[in-house]
């Protein structure tokens, strides 16, 4: 009898933990730069480019390319999600309001910007822990402006390093294969 109860408890615990293990991007909720809890399930069915950003980085001008990409493809079900992080040489020292002001005034960003997070180390955001452990795309975030292209099913379709410009043919050709046809 004790064995049966122990087995039942083990099954229930295993199922409970499996139910809370994220399997897609859409299983996460993140705080926006305005402090609002945003379920990423709101982007279900869209192609999503997740980018860790910084305002004082050599790659910061990529904000312009990210906005250009967003404007070009958003009517086809594409969105960019920016996740500011201060993990690399303190290149994102600003507060959330300062980050928003910088992005909207200097680069006219209209895509969603989220609250500053950590993308590495012990305090890595669960979203980035998931992104960096997915089969075929695993590996640490090595610098600002790493990009994950997520399909409409919430699974990673491609990963690009900091040096890949958002409007490069390398990224846009992969995006075109994932986006719904016109």
Across the structure, where does each feature detected by a protein language model lie?
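Amphipathic alpha-helical repeat scaffolds
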Residues: 32, 52-56
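Local sequence-structure signature of Cys/Sec-based thiol-disulfide redox active-site neighborhoods
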Residues: 44-49
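Thiol-/selenol-based redox modules, centered on thioredoxin-like
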Residues: 126-182
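N-terminal "domain-start" segment that seeds a small globular fold
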Residues: 19-41, 126
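Structural microenvironment flanking redox-active thiols in thiol-disulfide oxidoreductases
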Residues: 59-124
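Sec-dependent N-terminal signal peptides
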Residues: 4-13
């Amino acid at each position: 009898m004790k064995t049966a109860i122990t087995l039942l408890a083990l099954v229930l615990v295993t199922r409970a933990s499996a139910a809370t293990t994220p399997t897609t991007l859409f299983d996460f909720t993140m705080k926006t730069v305005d402090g609002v809890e945003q379920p990423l399930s709101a982007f279900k069915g869209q192609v999503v480019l997740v980018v860790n950003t910084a305002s004082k980085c050599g790659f910061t001008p990529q904000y312009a390319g990210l906005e250009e990409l967003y404007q070009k493809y958003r009517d086809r079900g594409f969105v960019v999600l920016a996740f500011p992080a201060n993990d690399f040489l303190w290149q994102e020292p600003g507060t959330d309001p300062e980050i928003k002001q910088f992005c909207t005034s200097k680069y006219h960003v209209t895509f969603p910007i989220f609250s500053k997070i950590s993308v590495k180390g012990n305090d890595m955001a669960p979203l980035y822990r998931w992104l960096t452990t997915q089969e075929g795309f695993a590996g640490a975030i090595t610098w600002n402006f790493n990009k994950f292209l997520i399909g409409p099913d919430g699974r990673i379709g491609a990963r690009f390093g900091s040096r890949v410009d958002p409007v490069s043919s390398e990224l846009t050709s992969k995006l075109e294969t994932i986006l719904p046809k016109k």
